[in-house]
C-alpha cells in the first residue's frame, strides 16, 4: 500500500518538513527555539484575533475598549495578558534563537540568515505598532517619539512623518492605520517564516560542532517532535506563570493612564525588548546619527557571514571567540538596563561606552579573534 503521507501533495510538504526530515543527531536544546517561535506566532495570531473582535481603533474609544475587554469579555483579561506577555516570550525566544545562530555559525546559511534578519525587523515593527493600540500615555508618546525619528531623514523627512501620521500629529488616522498594519503583519511574518524554513531545508540544519552531519542523520519524528513538545511545555509554563501571577511585570504603569497629548510622561521608554536599541539611539547626540545607529544595531547581523574569518564554523572549539560572545551578551544586557534609565550622568557615558563596545565586538574584535585562533591552531 502506498503511504498517503508520502504521496498526497499537501501531506508530502508536512511530511518532508516535520516527520521524515533528516536531522543531525547531536542538535541541542538551543535548536528548540525555531519551533517555540512558531508556537509564539500562532498564539499571538489567535489571541490577537479574539482581541480584534472587541477592540475599536478610534482615539475616543480605544482605551475604553481595552478596559471593556479586561472587565466584561469572558476571559478577556486572560486573552489580553496572554497577547501582551506572549510578545515578551516571542522576543526572548527570538534573541536566544539569533544568539544561537551567532554562536554556532548558522549565519553561514546566507539565505536562511538574511530572511531571519528580515523577520526580526518585521516582528519588531509589529510589536511597536501593537504597543500603540491600547492608547495609553506610553503608547501615544512612544508612537510620537519613534515615528518622529524619521524626520531626521534629509529632505523628505518631515513630509514622510506627516504622511505616516496622516496629519500634523499622532491622532485618529495614525491609530487606525497602525491597527490595520498590526493585523496584517503577523500573516506576512508567518509567510516569511515559511520561506525561512524552505531555505533551511535546502541545506539541512547546522549542529553544535559546525561540522557536516550528512553521515549521521536521524528522522525528525519521533526524536525531535518529542523534544519540541517538551520545549513547548516549558514555554507554556513560563508564559502561564507570568500571565497568572504578575501580568504587569514587564509593562509600563504609565500605559494605564489614557493618552494625553498635553501631558508628557517623565520618562518615555519602549517595551523592554527594544531598550538595547533605544540605548544605542540615545547614546549619539546627533538625531540622524542616532537613527542610523539604531537601524545598524540590527542590520549589522546581516554582515555576520562577511565578518566570519575563522576556518571553523562554530564557536564550540574557539575559547577566545566564546569569551567575546559572552562579553557581547553582557553588553546587550547593560544596554537594556541603560535604555530604561533617565538621560543623566552616569547613564549617558555608560550607554555610549556600551554602544561603542557593541559595534566594536561585532565588526572588529570578533573577526580579529577568529584570525588569531586560526594562527594559534597553525591553520
From Swiss-Prot:
Which residues does the annotation say bind heme b b566? 97, 196
Quick one: which residues bind a ubiquinone? 201
Gene Ontology annotations for the cellular component aspect, listed alphabetically: mitochondrial inner membrane; respiratory chain complex III
**Cofactor binding, note field:** Binds 2 heme b groups non-covalently.
Molecular function via GO: metal ion binding; ubiquinol-cytochrome-c reductase activity
Any one biological process term the GO annotation gives? mitochondrial electron transport, ubiquinol to cytochrome c
**Can the keyword Transcription regulation be found in this entry's annotation?**
no
Give the location in the cell: Mitochondrion inner membrane
Q: Which InterPro entries match?
A: Cyt_b/b6_C (IPR005798), Cyt_b/b6_C_sf (IPR036150), Cyt_b/b6_N (IPR005797), Cytb/b6-like_sf (IPR027387), Cytochrome_b (IPR030689), Cytochrome_b_C_euk/bac (IPR048260), Cytochrome_b_N_euk/bac (IPR048259), Di-haem_cyt_TM (IPR016174)
Membrane-crossing segments per the record: 33-53, 77-98, 113-133, 178-198, 226-246, 288-308, 320-340, 347-367
Membrane topology value = Multi-pass membrane protein
**Which Cys residues form disulphide pairs?**
none
Keyword list, A-Z? Electron transport, Heme, Iron, Membrane, Metal-binding, Mitochondrion, Mitochondrion inner membrane, Respiratory chain, Transmembrane, Transmembrane helix, Transport, Ubiquinone
- Known cofactor(s): heme b
Residue numbers binding heme b b562: 83, 182
Its biological function? Component of the ubiquinol-cytochrome c reductase complex (complex III or cytochrome b-c1 complex) that is part of the mitochondrial respiratory chain. The b-c1 complex mediates electron transfer from ubiquinol to cytochrome c. Contributes to the generation of a proton gradient across the mitochondrial membrane that is then used for ATP synthesis.
Assembly: The cytochrome bc1 complex contains 11 subunits: 3 respiratory subunits (MT-CYB, CYC1 and UQCRFS1), 2 core proteins (UQCRC1 and UQCRC2) and 6 low-molecular weight proteins (UQCRH/QCR6, UQCRB/QCR7, UQCRQ/QCR8, UQCR10/QCR9, UQCR11/QCR10 and a cleavage product of UQCRFS1). This cytochrome bc1 complex then forms a dimer.
Family (UniProt): Belongs to the cytochrome b family.
Question: Additional info?
Answer: Heme 1 (or BL or b562) is low-potential and absorbs at about 562 nm, and heme 2 (or BH or b566) is high-potential and absorbs at about 566 nm.
The protein's name is Cytochrome b
- Organism from which the protein derives: Scaptonyx fusicauda (Long-tailed mole)
Amino acid at each position: 500500500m502506498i503511504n498517503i503521507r508520502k504521496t498526497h501533495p499537501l501531506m508530502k510538504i508536512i511530511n518532508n518538513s516535520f516527520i521524515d526530515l533528516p536531522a543531525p543527531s547531536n542538535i541541542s536544546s538551543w535548536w528548540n527555539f525555531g519551533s517555540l517561535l512558531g508556537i509564539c506566532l500562532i498564539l499571538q495570531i489567535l489571541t490577537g484575533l479574539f482581541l480584534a473582535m472587541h477592540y475599536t481603533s478610534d482615539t475616543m474609544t480605544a482605551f475604553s475598549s481595552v478596559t471593556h475587554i479586561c472587565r466584561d469579555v469572558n476571559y478577556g483579561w486572560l486573552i489580553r495578558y496572554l497577547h501582551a506577555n506572549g510578545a515578551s516570550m516571542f522576543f526572548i525566544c527570538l534573541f536566544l534563537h539569533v544568539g544561537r545562530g551567532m554562536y554556532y555559525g548558522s549565519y553561514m546559511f546566507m539565505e536562511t540568515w538574511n530572511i531571519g534578519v528580515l523577520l526580526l525587523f518585521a516582528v519588531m515593527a509589529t510589536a511597536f505598532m501593537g504597543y500603540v493600540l491600547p492608547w495609553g500615555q506610553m503608547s501615544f508618546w512612544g508612537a510620537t517619539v519613534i515615528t518622529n525619528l524619521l524626520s531626521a531623514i534629509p529632505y523628505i523627512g518631515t513630509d514622510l512623518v506627516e504622511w505616516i501620521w496622516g496629519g500634523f500629529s499622532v491622532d485618529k488616522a495614525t491609530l487606525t492605520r497602525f491597527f490595520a498594519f498590526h493585523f496584517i503583519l503577523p500573516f506576512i511574518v508567518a509567510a516569511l517564516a515559511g520561506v525561512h524554513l524552505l531555505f533551511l531545508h535546502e541545506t539541512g540544519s547546522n549542529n553544535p560542532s559546525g561540522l557536516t552531519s550528512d553521515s549521521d542523520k536521524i528522522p525528525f519524528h519521533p526524536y525531535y517532535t518529542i523534544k519540541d513538545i517538551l520545549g513547548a511545555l516549558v514555554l507554556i509554563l513560563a508564559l502561564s506563570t507570568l500571565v497568572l501571577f504578575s501580568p504587569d511585570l514587564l509593562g509600563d504603569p504609565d500605559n494605564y493612564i489614557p493618552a494625553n497629548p498635553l501631558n508628557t510622561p517623565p520618562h518615555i521608554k519602549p517595551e523592554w525588548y527594544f531598550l538595547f536599541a533605544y540605548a544605542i539611539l540615545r547614546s549619539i547626540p546627533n538625531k540622524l546619527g542616532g537613527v542610523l545607529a539604531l537601524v545598524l544595531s540590527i542590520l549589522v547581523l546581516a554582515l555576520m557571514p562577511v565578518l566570519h574569518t575563522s576556518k571553523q564554523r562554530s564557536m564550540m572549539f574557539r575559547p577566545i571567540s566564546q569569551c567575546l560572545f559572552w562579553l557581547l551578551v553582557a553588553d546587550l544586557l547593560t544596554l537594556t538596563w541603560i535604555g530604561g534609565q533617565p538621560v543623566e550622568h552616569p547613564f549617558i557615558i555608560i550607554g555610549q561606552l556600551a554602544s561603542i563596545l557593541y559595534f566594536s565586538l561585532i565588526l572588529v574584535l570578533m573577526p580579529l579573534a577568529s584570525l588569531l585562533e586560526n594562527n594559534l591552531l597553525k591553520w
